[in-house]
UniProtKB/Swiss-Prot annotation:
One Gene Ontology term, aspect cellular component: extracellular region
Subcellular location: Secreted
Protein name as catalogued: U-scoloptoxin(19)-Sm1a
GO molecular-function term, one example from the UniProt record: toxin activity
Posttranslational modification: Contains 6 disulfide bonds.
Bridged cysteine pairs (disulfide): none
The organism of origin for this protein: Scolopendra morsitans (Tanzanian blue ringleg centipede)
TM helices/strands, residue ranges: none
Length: 107
């Protein structure tokens, strides 16, 4: 009986984690490099859609959406940091990060 309760609990937790994934899209390189962000497709106006640039999340209804002209690090899914982020650095962003930091999009 204890085993069945444990299995039921694990299945419930797993289903909650999976169902919450659509609420938390993550940046993907192809989309970020095109100046977009990965979002639920129903949240992006047609004229801003950039299909196929969030391939890892496509099955969950997530795709690339061009961002508004506001060009900030956070609007591209980035974070201002002093860490070395290699190819994840957004060099083409005219970002708002403080001096001595760079905009990195962690994938």
């Amino acid at each position: 009986m204890r085993f069945l309760v444990s299995v039921a609990f694990l299945l419930t937790v797993s289903s909650l984690l999976v169902s919450g994934e659509n609420n938390n899209p993550v940046p993907e390189d192809p989309c970020s490099k095109e100046g977009g962000v990965c979002v639920a497709v129903d949240r992006c106006p047609d004229e801003y859609k950039k299909p196929g640039l969030c391939p890892k999340q496509k099955a969950r209804g997530i795709d690339c959406c061009a961002i508004a002209p506001r060009d900030t690090c956070a609007s591209r899914g980035g974070e201002c940091t002093t860490l070395d982020c290699g190819r994840m650095e957004q060099k083409d962003v005219n970002h708002d990060c403080p001096p001595g930091t760079k905009c990195c999009v962690w994938v």
